[in-house]
Design a protein with these regions (language model features):
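Short catalytic-loop micro-motif centered on adjacent basic/acidic residues
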Residues: 1, 79-80, 104
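Donor-nucleotide binding loops and adjacent catalytic segments primarily
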Residues: 1-58
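Residues at alpha-helix caps and immediate loop-helix transition turns in enzyme cores, especially N-
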Residues: 10-11, 91, 143
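A donor-sugar binding/catalytic signature common to diverse glycosyltransferases
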Residues: 46-94
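C-terminal amphipathic helix plus adjacent low-complexity
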Residues: 112-156
Protein backbone atom coordinates (compact mmCIF):
# COMPACT_ATOMS: atom_id res chain seq x y z
CA UNK A 1 0.00 0.00 0.00
CA UNK A 2 2.89 2.31 -0.50
CA UNK A 3 5.47 3.67 1.82
CA UNK A 4 4.07 5.70 4.70
CA UNK A 5 0.35 4.99 4.36
CA UNK A 6 0.17 2.12 6.84
CA UNK A 7 3.37 0.75 8.43
CA UNK A 8 4.32 -2.57 6.80
CA UNK A 9 4.15 -4.63 10.01
CA UNK A 10 0.70 -3.26 10.86
CA UNK A 11 -0.49 -3.90 7.30
CA UNK A 12 0.70 -7.51 7.51
CA UNK A 13 -0.88 -8.09 10.91
CA UNK A 14 -4.25 -6.56 9.98
CA UNK A 15 -4.50 -8.14 6.51
CA UNK A 16 -3.57 -11.55 7.96
CA UNK A 17 -6.12 -11.16 10.74
CA UNK A 18 -8.80 -10.26 8.20
CA UNK A 19 -8.13 -12.98 5.61
CA UNK A 20 -6.00 -15.75 7.13
CA UNK A 21 -7.77 -19.11 6.93
CA UNK A 22 -10.22 -17.69 4.35
CA UNK A 23 -10.86 -19.09 0.89
CA UNK A 24 -8.88 -16.22 -0.68
CA UNK A 25 -5.22 -16.23 -1.67
CA UNK A 26 -3.68 -13.00 -0.35
CA UNK A 27 -0.61 -11.43 -1.96
CA UNK A 28 1.20 -8.63 -0.12
CA UNK A 29 3.98 -6.73 -1.90
CA UNK A 30 6.40 -5.05 0.49
CA UNK A 31 10.15 -4.61 0.53
CA UNK A 32 9.84 -3.93 4.28
CA UNK A 33 8.60 -7.42 5.15
CA UNK A 34 10.45 -10.70 4.86
CA UNK A 35 9.35 -13.10 2.16
CA UNK A 36 6.77 -15.52 3.52
CA UNK A 37 4.23 -18.12 2.42
CA UNK A 38 1.88 -19.03 5.23
CA UNK A 39 -1.27 -20.92 4.30
CA UNK A 40 -3.16 -18.50 2.03
CA UNK A 41 -1.01 -15.41 2.70
CA UNK A 42 2.00 -14.75 0.47
CA UNK A 43 4.50 -11.92 1.00
CA UNK A 44 7.30 -10.84 -1.34
CA UNK A 45 8.99 -7.59 -2.34
CA UNK A 46 7.18 -7.68 -5.71
CA UNK A 47 4.48 -9.59 -7.54
CA UNK A 48 3.42 -9.64 -11.16
CA UNK A 49 0.16 -7.82 -10.56
CA UNK A 50 -0.75 -8.02 -14.24
CA UNK A 51 -1.00 -11.80 -13.80
CA UNK A 52 -2.55 -11.71 -10.31
CA UNK A 53 -5.22 -9.18 -11.30
CA UNK A 54 -6.43 -11.54 -14.04
CA UNK A 55 -7.75 -13.79 -11.23
CA UNK A 56 -8.41 -11.20 -8.51
CA UNK A 57 -11.80 -10.49 -6.96
CA UNK A 58 -10.52 -7.47 -4.99
CA UNK A 59 -7.48 -5.18 -5.09
CA UNK A 60 -6.46 -3.48 -1.83
CA UNK A 61 -3.95 -0.69 -2.39
CA UNK A 62 -2.80 2.83 -1.48
CA UNK A 63 -4.54 4.72 -4.29
CA UNK A 64 -1.58 5.56 -6.49
CA UNK A 65 -2.36 6.17 -10.15
CA UNK A 66 -0.60 3.03 -11.40
CA UNK A 67 -2.37 0.74 -8.93
CA UNK A 68 -5.75 2.28 -9.59
CA UNK A 69 -5.45 2.10 -13.38
CA UNK A 70 -4.10 -1.48 -13.34
CA UNK A 71 -7.02 -2.57 -11.18
CA UNK A 72 -9.54 -0.91 -13.48
CA UNK A 73 -7.93 -2.24 -16.66
CA UNK A 74 -8.47 -5.71 -15.20
CA UNK A 75 -12.02 -4.86 -14.09
CA UNK A 76 -11.24 -5.51 -10.42
CA UNK A 77 -13.12 -3.57 -7.70
CA UNK A 78 -10.85 -1.81 -5.25
CA UNK A 79 -10.47 -1.11 -1.56
CA UNK A 80 -8.27 1.98 -1.29
CA UNK A 81 -6.29 3.16 1.76
CA UNK A 82 -4.99 6.54 0.53
CA UNK A 83 -3.37 8.04 3.60
CA UNK A 84 -2.72 11.78 3.44
CA UNK A 85 -1.38 12.17 -0.12
CA UNK A 86 -3.70 14.36 -2.22
CA UNK A 87 -3.40 12.31 -5.44
CA UNK A 88 -4.22 9.10 -3.59
CA UNK A 89 -7.15 10.68 -1.73
CA UNK A 90 -8.50 12.05 -5.02
CA UNK A 91 -8.13 8.66 -6.73
CA UNK A 92 -9.80 6.87 -3.81
CA UNK A 93 -12.69 9.34 -3.83
CA UNK A 94 -13.08 8.85 -7.60
CA UNK A 95 -13.19 5.06 -7.25
CA UNK A 96 -15.87 5.35 -4.56
CA UNK A 97 -17.91 7.98 -6.47
CA UNK A 98 -17.94 5.73 -9.54
CA UNK A 99 -19.02 2.73 -7.42
CA UNK A 100 -15.92 0.73 -8.38
CA UNK A 101 -14.78 0.29 -4.79
CA UNK A 102 -14.61 1.76 -1.31
CA UNK A 103 -12.22 3.85 0.77
CA UNK A 104 -10.66 3.02 4.14
CA UNK A 105 -9.18 5.90 6.08
CA UNK A 106 -6.03 5.27 8.13
CA UNK A 107 -7.91 5.31 11.45
CA UNK A 108 -10.34 2.67 10.07
CA UNK A 109 -7.57 0.23 9.13
CA UNK A 110 -8.71 -2.73 11.22
CA UNK A 111 -9.32 -6.35 10.28
CA UNK A 112 -13.03 -5.97 10.98
CA UNK A 113 -13.42 -2.88 8.77
CA UNK A 114 -11.38 -4.38 5.95
CA UNK A 115 -13.30 -7.64 6.03
CA UNK A 116 -16.69 -5.89 6.16
CA UNK A 117 -15.86 -3.55 3.28
CA UNK A 118 -14.27 -6.35 1.26
CA UNK A 119 -17.40 -8.49 1.66
CA UNK A 120 -19.60 -5.56 0.66
CA UNK A 121 -17.56 -4.98 -2.51
CA UNK A 122 -17.46 -8.64 -3.51
CA UNK A 123 -21.17 -9.16 -2.83
CA UNK A 124 -22.34 -6.10 -4.77
CA UNK A 125 -22.50 -6.87 -8.46
CA UNK A 126 -22.78 -3.14 -9.17
CA UNK A 127 -19.23 -2.49 -7.91
CA UNK A 128 -17.83 -5.31 -10.00
CA UNK A 129 -19.77 -4.09 -13.06
CA UNK A 130 -18.63 -0.50 -12.49
CA UNK A 131 -14.97 -1.51 -12.23
CA UNK A 132 -15.30 -3.51 -15.45
CA UNK A 133 -17.08 -0.64 -17.24
CA UNK A 134 -14.42 1.88 -16.17
CA UNK A 135 -11.72 -0.51 -17.37
CA UNK A 136 -13.38 -0.79 -20.79
CA UNK A 137 -13.65 3.00 -20.93
CA UNK A 138 -9.92 3.37 -20.20
CA UNK A 139 -9.03 0.87 -22.93
CA UNK A 140 -11.32 2.64 -25.41
CA UNK A 141 -9.64 6.00 -24.65
CA UNK A 142 -6.52 4.75 -26.43
CA UNK A 143 -3.82 5.05 -23.75
CA UNK A 144 -0.21 5.89 -24.46
CA UNK A 145 -0.48 5.01 -28.15
CA UNK A 146 -3.09 7.69 -28.69
CA UNK A 147 -1.00 10.28 -26.83
CA UNK A 148 2.03 9.50 -29.00
CA UNK A 149 -0.04 9.74 -32.19
CA UNK A 150 -1.42 13.10 -31.07
CA UNK A 151 2.07 14.41 -30.29
CA UNK A 152 3.31 13.31 -33.71
CA UNK A 153 0.28 14.87 -35.36
CA UNK A 154 0.87 18.14 -33.49
CA UNK A 155 4.54 18.21 -34.50
CA UNK A 156 3.86 17.71 -38.20
Amino acid sequence: MGNGTIPAKKMRRVICEAFEHSDYEIYIASSYLKKEDRENVHIAPRWDFHTLLEEAVLFIHHGGQNSMVEGLLHGVPQLVVPGKVFERKYNAKSIAEHHAGLVIEEHEFTAETILNKAKKIMEEDTMIASAQALGRKLVKAGGAGKIIREIHRGCS
